[in-house]
């Protein structure tokens, strides 16, 4: 009853503290720089990670800026089409997940050999993809064919991550399915 709930809450709070230490140690061990503003023109230093405002323990690094526009030529007339991701776009995601420990395991869903079908969900639809970290990463990447690395706390991951209070890093890329 009451005592169990109280102990569970204390255990969760301690696990969150350990999780925050694990994230801090990961950054320290790898010599990453924590920045508080995204670089202008999407030119990121190799070791720069944005501590996303409003999400103190979510970190983002843009590796490759994707395709912001497409130019279509119809009837000899060029049309510029903005490719920014909008809510309900069907996202096709490939990723490599890694633990933040010193001898980390990596699980890869990067190619069709590793995972026949990529992870798909509609951007902004938390019923399809409960991992709020993915939605935030897509928002920050903005454009299809972008690649990034994120470090996210368990509370922003999949339900299994939340329950185990395990933070992960993800190297990810996405496309918008037409």
Map each language-model feature to its residues.
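A short beta-strand signature
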Residues: 87-101
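A beta-strand/beta-hairpin structural motif
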Residues: 63-65, 70-80, 99-178
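A short, polar/charged loop/turn motif at coil->beta-strand junctions and beta-hairpin connectors
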Residues: 52-56, 87, 144
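Sec-dependent bacterial lipoprotein signal peptides
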Residues: 1-7
């Amino acid at each position: 009853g009451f005592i169990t709930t109280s102990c569970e809450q204390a255990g969760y709070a301690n696990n969150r503290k350990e999780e925050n230490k694990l994230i801090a140690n990961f950054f320290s061990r790898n010599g990453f720089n924590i920045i508080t503003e995204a670089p202008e023109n999407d030119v990121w230093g190799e070791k720069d990670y944005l501590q996303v405002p409003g999400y103190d323990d979510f970190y983002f690094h843009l590796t490759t800026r994707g395709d912001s526009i497409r130019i279509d030529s119809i009837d000899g007339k060029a049309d510029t089409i903005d490719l920014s991701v909008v809510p309900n776009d069907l996202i096709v995601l490939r990723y490599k997940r890694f633990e933040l420990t010193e001898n980390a395991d990596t699980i890869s869903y990067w190619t069709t050999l590793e995972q026949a079908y990529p992870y798909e969900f509609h951007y902004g639809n938390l019923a399809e993809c409960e991992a709020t970290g993915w939605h935030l990463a897509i928002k920050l990447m903005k454009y299809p064919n972008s690649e990034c690395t994120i470090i996210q706390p368990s509370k922003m991951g999949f339900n299994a991550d939340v329950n185990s209070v395990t933070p992960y890093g993800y190297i990810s890329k996405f496309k918008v399915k037409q």
